[in-house]
């Protein structure tokens, strides 16, 4: 299967299954091979048998979902995800893919699935990605930034991570600091965390009066973290802000903000900064490669 010869892979797997018909992994491999060779109907036949098994795992349901999507059978796919989440109620990947199905049919309930995925499986990145994209395209100006930055740190080297960095810069420019008063229109915001975030950012907003460059964003975010840990951190422990404070104490917050915003804000200025601060940037890069960023349980503050 790894060589891309799916026809032969199917033959080999079918023969292996005849000898060992109860082997779950062989059936999963057969489903994937049929899916990759675009024989979706046969893939569905195997996938349905898989998901009916008592020992079916999350991947079985994910595969079946992909086959239903390929066959453009959203109603059957919807039933499948409901069945899957009854069996695996804390599966981030299943919530993420269920939300993607709903979004593809223009059903805005997709965000409820992504939020639930973040709440029950905070270490999985896909729901942050989908939720951040959703919030970038609605009026929200908090969770697009929070979830977007969490995702960028979870997938710091991926293409999706690079695209999210561009959206983050746009979010700060076009959403968070679009109004002089950041609290405008936030009277009905149910999340105390979100209101506190905006109130704290609002007190730094005057720094944006001359425009938002990477340097200005670094100043704003530095002041935000200092004030947050003076006033709000005890009430709202949050791994993303802990990480920012860690970078600040280690003298790497400037480099982090350059990495986060610089290439999209002003590529020439970013490249010049990395050359004139070569050691500082190298230290940050080495630190970044040495750690894995994950959100812990118990830090979910969204209220819908």
Regions found by a protein language model. Give the residues of each.
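Canonical positions in the second alpha-helix
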Residues: 15-16, 49-50, 83-84, 116-117, ...
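Eukaryotic alpha-helical solenoid repeat scaffolds
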Residues: 123-304
């Amino acid at each position: 299967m790894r060589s891309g010869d799916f026809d032969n892979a199917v033959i080999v797997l079918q023969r292996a299954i005849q000898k060992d018909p109860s082997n779950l992994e062989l059936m999963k491999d057969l489903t994937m091979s049929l899916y990759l060779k675009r024989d979706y109907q046969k893939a569905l036949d195997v996938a349905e048998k898989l998901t009916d098994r008592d020992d079916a795992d999350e991947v079985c349901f994910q595969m079946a979902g992909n086959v239903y999507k390929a066959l453009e059978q959203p109603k059957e796919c919807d039933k499948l995800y409901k069945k899957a989440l009854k069996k695996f109620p804390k599966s981030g990947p299943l919530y993420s893919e269920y939300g993607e199905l709903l979004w593809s049919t223009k059903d805005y309930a997709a965000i409820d699935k992504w939020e639930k995925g973040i709440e029950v499986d905070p270490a999985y990145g896909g729901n942050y990605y989908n939720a951040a994209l959703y919030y970038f395209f609605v009026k929200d100006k908090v969770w697009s930034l929070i979830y977007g930055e969490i995702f960028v740190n979870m997938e710091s080297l991926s293409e999706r991570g690079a695209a999210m960095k561009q959206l983050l810069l746009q979010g700060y420019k076009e959403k968070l600091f679009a109004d002089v008063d950041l609290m405008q229109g936030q009277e009905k915001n149910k999340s105390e965390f979100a209101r506190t975030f905006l109130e704290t950012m609002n007190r730094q907003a005057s720094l944006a009066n001359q425009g938002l460059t990477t340097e200005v964003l670094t100043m704003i975010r530095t002041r935000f973290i200092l004030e947050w840990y003076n006033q709000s951190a005890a009430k709202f422990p949050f791994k993303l802000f802990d990480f920012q404070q860690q970078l600040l104490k280690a003298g790497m917050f400037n480099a982090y903000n350059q990495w986060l915003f610089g290439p999209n804000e002003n590529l020439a200025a970013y490249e010049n900064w990395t050359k004139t601060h070569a050691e500082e940037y190298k230290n940050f890069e080495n630190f970044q490669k040495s750690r894995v960023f994950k959100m812990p349980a118990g830090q979910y503050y969204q209220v819908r």
